[in-house]
Every structure is written in structure tokens, then in C-alpha cells.
Amino acid sequence: MAPKPGAEWSTALSHLVLGVVSLHAAVSTAEASRGAAAGFLLQVLAATTTLAPGLSTHEDCLAGAWVATVIGLPLLAFDFHWVNGDRSSANLLLGGGMVLAVAGGHLGPEGRSVAGQAMLLVVAVTILIVAVFTANTYGMWGGAMLGVAGLLSRLEEDRLLLLPKEDVCRWALAVGSWAYCRALHTQRLQWE
């Protein structure tokens, strides 16, 4: 099946926006929240390897997206939980992500897809729960948008809102990452 006109443009733009938002978030959170900054940086690297022509193969791009999902997202949530005193959830999320990263080579493509989506949803739900209890509106929006990205990725449709499904998921991740960066900033202001 031939790609739809504009699909490559849409894909490149969604990767670029996710990369720029994540880079801004990494720089903004680097001093106060190194774990979250590392998670945002992994998203930047995954987007960059996809955008750079000849830099990597399709398999490398998939591996980068896998690492950004199973290690990067738990790193984002780690600091949010840790600062709010929920150290067991923080350690459990990060440990689970590390185990998934190591086990990824033993999973088939469908297994990696399900594990990545599950990790995305678990991170989204835990961020949402902490944000609700701490009344952090940006955290609520960030958790909700990460959850939307995870749920959209499970849909059977190839296109959503006239765009490829993966692009819509990246747009949702970009909005969620921006909101989560703001949530970390708000959280830091509350603790100062």
C-alpha cells in the first residue's frame, strides 16, 4: 500500500515537535530533576535518530523508541513520585522499566508493543494519581495526555483525525511532556 500524500511530512513534523518539546523540558528540568531530564533526553534521542537520514536503520529507530518508552517514561515519573514521598512506587516503576529494557530482546514485536503500551499507561496513571492528590493541574493534564497516547496506540485504525495513528500519538506525547514539564516546575515551586 502506497503512503498517503503528506504522511512523511506529518511524521517528520510530529517527531520534530516531540523532540523540541522534550529538549526544552530536559533543559528546563536538568538542575532540579535529573531523572526527569534524562527521561526527556531519551525522548529527544529517539526522535533525532528517526529524523536524521542515514543515521540509523528502521530497527535502530524502533530500539530507540523502545528505550525511550521503557526507561525514559519511568525516569519521568520517578522524580514526580520521589519528591512527593512515594519512594516505593518510584523504585518500582524504574525497576520495572529496567527489567523490560533487558527483557526486550526476548520479546517478539507484539510483546514489545504490549509491554511498551502497558508501561506508558502505568506511568500515566501513576502520574495522574499523584497529581490529583497534590492538586497539580499540569500533572493531571500530563498524565491524561500520556494516557491518551497509550490508549490511541491500541486502536486498530491506521489513521486518526486524518493523520497516521503514530503521529497523533506523538502529538499527544508532546503535549503530555510539555504539561509534565510544567507540573515538575509547579511541584518544585511548592516545595521551595
Curated annotation (Swiss-Prot):
Membrane-related topology note? Multi-pass membrane protein
Keyword annotations of the record:
Membrane, Signal, Transmembrane, Transmembrane helix
Q: Organism source for this protein? A: Homo sapiens (Human)
So which domain of life are we looking at? Eukaryota
Location, primary (coarse class): membrane
Q: Where in the cell is it found?
A: Membrane
Query: Is the keyword Transmembrane helix in the record?
Result: yes
Q: What is this protein called?
A: Transmembrane protein 276
Q: Which residues cross the membrane?
A: 35-55, 63-83, 89-109, 114-134
Give the signal peptide, or none. 1-32
Q: Which GO terms describe its cellular component?
A: membrane
